[in-house]
Amino acid sequence: MVRREKGYDPLRLTVRDHHRMNDTSKPGLKNFPIAFFSILMGLGGFATALRKGEEIFSLPSGGSRLVFILAGILFVLLSSLYLIKIVHHREAVMQELRHPVTLSFFSTLPITILLLSIGAYPEFPLLSKWFWGVGAAGQLGMTLYVLTTWIHQTHFQIEHSHPSWFIPVVGNIIVPVVGVEHAPLEISWFYFSFGLFFWIILQAIVLNRIFFHQPMAEKLIPTLFIMVAPPALGFISYLKITGELTQFAQLLYYIGGFITLLLLVQFRAFSRVKFFLSSWVYSFPAAAITIATLVMYDKTQVIFFRQAGLALLLLLGLLMLWLVVSTVNAIRHHGFCLPE
């Protein structure tokens, strides 16, 4: 049975909040969550997977370009809204920064910028380089802030930990994907190394929390899919850095593949979880393992990876369609989340 944890829900956004977003004189903007940027991570990941699929299957490139443009437009919109929140509701922002759950979601902002950098390359290399520089610097700053907060905190409990804690780590592993084109190779190795190191540590902490403590709140169940992202992205980044499909790269890929399989066999359990805004976190990890599988085919030319990559890409497309339709329906029915 799924239990509901009491406390602040970083991914809760009601339709009432949605209607108040654009009015800074009303308190609705005060509740606009930083975690809303996780939607942009999903769109950026989907666009990247779609572009890789267009390359492998010789498809027109218009689809991925449109999704990247949409992600860019939404990024400007959401960033503007959150900037207004910082100006008018600074204490609410500080509460998010101090909260053990919402703290990790601040890394979704530099991660989105890094994904836009990937989208801009190679057609707009200068723009991509600027995005990458801002995203990489922001990601390093957020990682240092988050880790420092964890070290010196006095109120966190094991129940506060869950897979969203991987988000700051995932951002560092993304840096080399296009960073190898914009900066000395040692910088990519730097981000990759400590990102991988802290992924291993956090994996143990999160599994301990899942196995031996109270079940996560229903709205946080989708975050289990975040566990797919670090090894899948680690595989992609390692190949970008080395250019070779080594045994270590294969190790990373198959860890990500196994975690994906482990979660897919629990489809019935996940299907019983009602739609929340947090359901968007399915999308980015699904995109990561899809890209990794297509890259695996590109390197090995083994037909299995081609077929698996195609299947995952189709499933990812259906997932994105479901997320969009469910979000629209939630707005029409006056709420994203169930009442507390």
Regions found by a protein language model. Give the residues of each.
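Short, Lys/Arg-rich, polar N-terminal cytosolic tail immediately upstream
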Residues: 2-4, 10-29
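Juxtamembrane helix-loop boundaries in multi-pass membrane proteins
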Residues: 22-48, 64, 68, 90-115, ...
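Helix-coil boundary and interhelical linker segments in multi-pass alpha-helical membrane proteins
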Residues: 50-64, 118-129, 175-189, 237-248, ...
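Structural signature of hydrophobic alpha-helical transmembrane segments
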Residues: 66-79, 126-140, 186-199, 247-258, ...
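C-terminal functional regions that serve as terminal interaction/effector modules
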Residues: 79-81, 256-263, 282-340
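Alpha-helical transmembrane segments in multipass membrane proteins, preferentially the mid-helix core
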Residues: 145-146, 177, 201-210, 233-240, ...
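Aromatic-anchored, glycine/proline-accented short structural segments
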Residues: 194-253
